[in-house]
Amino acid sequence: MSTIVSVWAREILDSRGNPTIEVEVSLESGHSGRAAVPSGASTGTREALELRDGDKGRYKGKGVEKAVDNVMGEIAEAVIGLDALRQVQLDNTLLDLDGTDNKERLGANAMLGVSLATARAASSFLGLPLYQYLGGVNAKVLPVPLMNIINGGAHAPNNLDIQEFMIMPIGAATFRDALRMGAETFHTLKALLAADGHVTSVGDEGGFAPNLKSHDEAFKYITRAIEESGYIPGAEIALAIDAAASEFYRDGKYHLAGEGKTFSNSEMTEWLGEFTAKYPLISIEDGLAEGDWEGWGELTYKLGDTVQLVGDDIFVTNPDILAQGIDEGVANSILIKLNQIGTLTETLDTIEMAKQAAYTTVISHRSGETEDHFIADLAVGLNAGQIKTGSLCRSDRLAKYNQLLRIEEDLDDAGIYFGPMIASHFGYEGDEEFEDA
């Protein structure tokens, strides 16, 4: 009864107006699952390949009809007849069918759509919420949201090199409270920026995209917004950034155009360290470039005991690359993006490896998103503890937050909010003194 009987795919649009793929998998029982695949702007060079058509006369080359055809053709032929409850078998079938290291033949977007839609169909067949199907009876941890409230870099047309400035409501008692604290701070920040004559248009992920004098000014605005919202910077709301340093790394140097500075990896580490001393900055993603493994080692040695150092571009959700990072003492956390690796099984393997090595995990969206909220269920199902899914506006971001509210309601008293735990993991007490906070 849980046998796959049909697979369908279509081309839809993501939050940037670019095509992406949506897949539906139907079972013999009549149950079905649907999944839409996101797309990134700043991408790691070793990510699994997102298959695009390349026809400049259609969607400027970004169409995904080839991926759709692959799903409707040889992928459907290979998976029809498989049991949707056997996710590992299904994903291995996809991997064998593609036969390449980076999924370039069938496309990671095509494969992931089938993989996730199958999981949804299976959970529907069993009558289980998706988070419980993915994680079992112990799925109970509501993640701390890393809320992107100022955008820069590849996500916004402004002069900030750092791609994301985020807030983490670590002092909240529940996810519901965390969401409220973040929303209040977001609206306060908007008012502060507008009062000073800054534009309050938003970037790809819903954060504001002002032209500021410096990155330091961005931190000042955010800490002021936290305070004027009635919260304590650090104790109740901490800060996080995604530097996306690969985007401004050239010829072995870090070129910060907005700052008018060029840094070596040691100088870049020192610059980031200054912010952690000055502000309650407890999480840095992609502080150095993906190819700068030597620099990452130094960054981890100098800041890794007290700051969460999240590897995104350097690890690309790949268990083999993560294993190398663990062996070499690089980073202490990994960003998890489903479309970087291309199947649910490989994603779960990467999360398990990270947990075994005491690396924290952050489940993440992409800058080109859809209304699909699979990652919200994944974050709770795997007790990941953290989720990064944009700002407090744009329905493609809020879809994930609203799903987490529903999950928290469903869990009732069994749900645990991860805020205090992520702080204690890095020895952060919340009462530290900072120069400007």
Curated annotation (Swiss-Prot):
It is found in: Cytoplasm; Secreted; Cell surface. It catalyses: (2R)-2-phosphoglycerate = phosphoenolpyruvate + H2O. It comes from the Bacteria. Its cofactor is Mg(2+). GO terms for cellular component: cell surface; extracellular region; phosphopyruvate hydratase complex. GO terms for molecular function: magnesium ion binding; phosphopyruvate hydratase activity. InterPro entries: Enolase, Enolase-like_C_sf, Enolase-like_N, Enolase_C, Enolase_CS, Enolase_N. Keywords: Cytoplasm, Glycolysis, Lyase, Magnesium, Metal-binding, Secreted. Pfam families: Enolase_C, Enolase_N. Binds a second Mg(2+) ion via substrate during catalysis. The keyword Metal-binding applies. (2R)-2-phosphoglycerate binds at residues 163, 337, 366-367, 388. Gene3D superfamilies: Enolase-like C-terminal domain (3.20.20.120), Enolase-like, N-terminal domain (3.30.390.10). The active site is at 205 (proton donor), 337 (proton acceptor). One of its GO terms (biological process) is glycolytic process. Mg(2+) binds at residues 242, 285, 312. It is an enzyme of class 4 (lyase). The keyword Metal-binding applies. Its EC number is 4.2.1.11. Pathway: Carbohydrate degradation; glycolysis; pyruvate from D-glyceraldehyde 3-phosphate: step 4/5. NCBIfam families: eno (TIGR01060). Belongs to the enolase family. Catalyzes the reversible conversion of 2-phosphoglycerate (2-PG) into phosphoenolpyruvate (PEP). It is essential for the degradation of carbohydrates via glycolysis. This is Enolase. It comes from Nitratidesulfovibrio vulgaris (strain ATCC 29579 / DSM 644 / CCUG 34227 / NCIMB 8303 / VKM B-1760 / Hildenborough). The gene is eno.
